[in-house]
Amino acid sequence: MVRKMTAMLAYHGFSKGTFIGHSYGTSWLSYMCKYAQSAVAALLFLDPICFCLYHPHLTKSFVYHQPDPGSVAFIVRTDMMVSWTIQRAFPWTWIVLFLEQIRVPCTVFIG
């Protein structure tokens, strides 16, 4: 994906871009910070998931906590594809991002 994003920038005549990610989309910003720093001018994280993946209580609560039936959290957590992605196919170690890895202007919004 990083190659595709940098190729997209080059195709449009840009060497750098400002990237915005929301929730799961912040994982792509994490990849850009780690593997294509030269293509990143600035970052905007909206409700990021990539910063606290090393805190076991946060990830454990999403994977194992049973929310109240009928709530939005219940619907999201019990969706077959969301459940499979988080429990079986989520690249935790690739997505986690530490502040030291960000070397460009960055803004984080948490809702």
What are these regions (language model features)?
Residues K34, L58-V63:
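Short secondary-structure boundary/capping segments
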Residues K16-G21, L46:
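Short beta-strand immediately N-terminal to the catalytic nucleophile in serine-hydrolase-like folds
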Residues L44-P56:
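Active-site nucleophile loop of the alpha/beta-hydrolase fold
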Residues V2-G17:
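Conserved acidic catalytic loop of the alpha/beta-hydrolase fold
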Residues F62-E100, V104:
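Mobile cap/lid helix-loop segments that gate and shape the active-site cleft of serine hydrolases
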Residues F19-L29, C33:
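Gly/Ala-rich beta-loop-alpha elbow adjacent to hydrolase catalytic centers
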Residues I102, V108-G111:
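Short beta-strand/loop motif that positions the catalytic acidic residue
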